[in-house]
Each structure stands twice: as structure tokens, then as C-alpha cells.
Amino acid sequence: MKTQQIAQQLILGSSSIYRRDLLQRLQIPFDVSNPDIDETPLPGETPDATAVRLAAAKTRAVAATHPGALIIGADQVAVFEGIQLGKPLNHLNATRQLQLIRGKEVSFYTALCLFNSAQDTTRARLVPSRVKFRLLSDRQIENYLDKEQPYHCAASSKLEGLGIALIEHMEGEDPTALIGLPLIALVEMLTLEGVEIV
């Protein structure tokens, strides 16, 4: 398999192995850098604005040590009935989140940002998805949490893994957005930056 060569260094600003795996699908060379940013929502900030701001902040954090690179940043926020569902961080919070959203619809906002640090230009896109969760029993929730431990996933939903079994149906323009990196939008952005994928 031959990988495409690109003129600028391409960097994925993420610690997520799932975003890295998604980007590898495009068969282009890239490096990974973990952006160390505060992901706390700002007071009064809407969930979609939070996602866009954090995706952009990740690219800027990486750009500080990688001048001249094309930097990809992404962030995802889940919302249920106007409430932002963050990363649960532990078993108890994950149980509560999944009990709250079982049988219900949750909106996921996945923001994508491509920062050209050589030209100081940014391209950004917000890709919304709606997910209807199955009406899960407490036993099913417990089984899922024991097997997957999705404590660092928005809404306790590790959709790139066993979390797919929690879904009754989903609506959205890009299925990869739910995993955290909307590849359809990314291909368009990279093409505009002169990176040929195919």
C-alpha cells in the first residue's frame, strides 16, 4: 500500500487512539501530538460552541511547538435535553449518565478544525449527529461498563467499541463523526489545503 506524500507536515492534535486510527484510513503520513488544554466549558457557552472552541484550541496548542505544520484538532460534546454530558471519569457517573439517556435521543456535536500554522489560517466545521439509545436494563448498563469502561468518552458512549450496541438508530452526515473525527469534512478541508487524498 502506497501512502500519499504531502508538502507540509500533518499533525493530529489528539491523544485518542481512535482518532489516530480513523486518520490512518486516509493513507497519508502524519504525526501525533497530545495537546494539553483545559477542556472545561465556559460559563454560558453553548455545547456546539464548546466543541468548536476546544477543537481550535487543540490546534493552537500543538502549533506552539510545530510551526509551519497543518494541524488537525477535533472535539465532541454530547447534549441531552439541554444538558451537556461530559466525560463521566468514573463508574458511578457513567452508570448515572447511561440510566439518564437510555431509551432517549442524544445530540453529539463533533467539531473539526484544520489550522495551517504556516499561513495562520483556520478551517472549521461542526458535524452534528443524533443518537437514539436502546432502552437498556440496569444489568445491560453494568455489563457494558464492566467490559468497556468508557470513563473518558462523552455521555459514557464509546461508540467505536462496544458502545455501538447501545444504539437503536442514529442520524448524521458522517458516521466517523460519532467516533470523533469527521473524515468526510476532513478530506474536503485537506483538499482545499492542497493535500490530495486520492
UniProtKB/Swiss-Prot annotation:
Gene3D superfamilies: 3.90.950.10. Its EC number is 3.6.1.-. The record marks Y18, Q76, E160 as: Important for substrate specificity. The active site is at D75 (proton acceptor). GO terms for biological process: nucleotide metabolic process. GO terms for cellular component: cytoplasm. The keyword Cytoplasm applies. It catalyses: N(7)-methyl-GTP + H2O = N(7)-methyl-GMP + diphosphate + H(+). Keywords: Cytoplasm, Hydrolase, Nucleotide metabolism. Nucleoside triphosphate pyrophosphatase that hydrolyzes 7-methyl-GTP (m(7)GTP). May have a dual role in cell division arrest and in preventing the incorporation of modified nucleotides into cellular nucleic acids. Belongs to the Maf family. YceF subfamily. HAMAP family: Maf. This is 7-methyl-GTP pyrophosphatase. It comes from Nitrosospira multiformis (strain ATCC 25196 / NCIMB 11849 / C 71). The lineage of its organism: Bacteria, Pseudomonadati, Pseudomonadota, Betaproteobacteria, Nitrosomonadales.
